Amino acid sequence: AGGGPIYTASKHAIAGLVKELAYELAPKIRVNGVAPGVIATAMGMPKALGEQVPSVIAGVEQALPLPFIPHSDDYVELYLLLASDAAKTMTGTIIQADNGISIRGLVKTSGGL
């Protein structure tokens, strides 16, 4: 469930790559990453779910500490912040921008999960 060991290994590999690139490219280039959670995209909301999509979305939203599913546009300001001087002290960091899913993961609710 959740993608299994290959998915998990790929996430850890990306985190390691961010840290290694941050080390190698400092001080001229800062490298940080963003780990989003569920995003409202065609890939995140497969058509195979058909008419079940609204109930699945409602169930996911109920399971999140910040109960909404963001769109890709919701991350723009975070990326701009990371590219700005406001983040000049940050490098090698992965920001969890996942509506709190990393706190406990998705838990089963009565809303469709």
Task: Give short role names for the model-derived ranges.
Residues A1-I6, P67, D85:
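Active-site loop immediately N-terminal to the catalytic Tyr-X3-Lys motif
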Residues R30-A40, A83, Q96-D98:
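Conserved SDR Rossmann-fold cofactor-binding beta-strand/turn motif
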Residues V38-A63, L106-L113:
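A glycine/serine/threonine-rich, flexible loop-to-helix segment
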Residues S10, V18:
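Active-site helix of classical SDR
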Residues L80, T91-L113:
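Short C-terminal tail/terminal secondary-structure segment
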Residues Y23-P27, K88:
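Alpha-helical segment proximal to the catalytic Tyr-Lys
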Residues Y75-V76, L82:
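Non-catalytic, hydrophobic alpha-helical segments
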Residues L64-Y75:
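A conserved structural motif in NAD(P)-dependent oxidoreductases
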